[in-house]
């Protein structure tokens, strides 16, 4: 997974 990947969106 890429370094900025998250299982949910964080804004």
UniProtKB/Swiss-Prot annotation:
Signal peptide: none annotated. One of its GO terms (molecular function) is toxin activity. The keyword Secreted applies. It comes from the Eukaryota. Keywords: Amphibian defense peptide, G-protein coupled receptor impairing toxin, Secreted, Toxin, Vasoactive, Vasodilator. The record marks 11 as: Not sulfated. Expressed by the skin glands. Its main location: secreted. GO terms for biological process: defense response; vasodilation. One of its GO terms (cellular component) is extracellular region. It is found in: Secreted. Produces in vitro relaxation of rat arterial smooth muscle and constriction of intestinal smooth muscle. May target bradykinin receptors (BDKRB). Belongs to the bradykinin-related peptide family. This is [Ala1,Thr6]-phyllokinin. It comes from Physalaemus signifer.
């Amino acid at each position: 997974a890429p370094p900025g990947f998250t299982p949910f969106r964080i804004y």
